[in-house]
Amino acid sequence: MGASKYMQELWRKKQSDVMRFLLRVRCWQYRQLSALHRAPRPTRPDKARRLGYKAKQGYVIYRVRVRRGGRKRPVPKGATYGKPVHHGVNQLKFARSLQSIAEERAGRHCGGLRVLNSYWVGEDSTYKFFEVILIDTFHKAIRRNPDMQWITKAVHKHREMRGLTSAGKKSRGLGKGHKFHLTIGGSRRAAWRRRNTLQLHRYR
């Protein structure tokens, strides 16, 4: 078993004594740092490489701390101004995952970089920690690499804001297989519109 496969198997057993100790120590370490900071190298090199990371110039890793829990509706003094059915303020759940929020915060902070992907590195009772892979699209090592030239195009600016990363697509219900039948046609709205539109063709 190679080193990468060995690490992968270690991370699969997060309840083992070794991983429980490591994750506890790392969570303590991450809590002492700022909510968003650059990591010198990926904590999970095997996972980062599976998501597209390479240990070469132009690739950057940022670690993000996101507070766990639901999302309170941002209204002054709970005044929602509407029907009682929409008066909810506290028990609301955000439509997107905490991972996609972490990607968005990293993308906002590093406006000149492109978000490629992200992965989980730890959590405690209050926070979740993610590492985000960002790419410097103006670096020659990226622009000259045929495998990564796609992300240098302008259409991929701030893809994390538009739900185009893996974590963003998950909350949009996009994917392959029987689990994702609600979004056949591109989105939930497109699928709903097609199923709820009566088409009376001229020749039928």
UniProtKB/Swiss-Prot annotation:
Subcellular location(s) of the protein: Cytoplasm
Pfam families cross-referenced by the UniProt entry: Ribosomal_L15e
Keyword list, A-Z: Cytoplasm, Ribonucleoprotein, Ribosomal protein
Keyword Nucleus set for record: no
SMART domains named among the record's database cross-references: Ribosomal_L15e
Subunit structure: Component of the large ribosomal subunit.
The name this protein goes by in its record: Large ribosomal subunit protein eL15
Organism: Silurus meridionalis (Southern catfish)
Source lineage: Eukaryota, Metazoa, Chordata, Craniata, Vertebrata
